[in-house]
């Protein structure tokens, strides 16, 4: 077992990040911290099997969307969303710490590969990220009435949800597992503002 773990550690040290610069990493960490704090999600807290299942289902969903993408807008959206999910897993465990963690290196390696993939298509990854982050922040409900209306909207689609207050906001989330949505996933407010990657990629709508 010690030999196996030693080989794994050596392998992690040999991973080279080509596209994920420190500047990008720290910017991603700050944005994800804002998201997770606003929505009452864990930051540097115990990472449970439930958390692991949720994060895994989210990245699986995004990679499926990437595989099904038929245009640059959908492809860029799936790539950035995938990095957003992976950074969520990372910040859950590391916060905005600049200390290096070999155990979490595979996450950063996956992030790096996704950014390189984005670059290969000529996308401005950071501009796409900023647009999607702003959109993700709009998922929060600004009043309890908005949260209740959002819950009713999901109920009309037979999606069981609930909401909780976090600071000055209310967050709607999936209540219980379903075939394609895990319990605890943050859901969009009815006043959610979709990302506009058409504008980012082409400068037009």
Regions flagged by a language model, labelled:
Residues 2-205:
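Flexible "arm" and connector segments at domain edges
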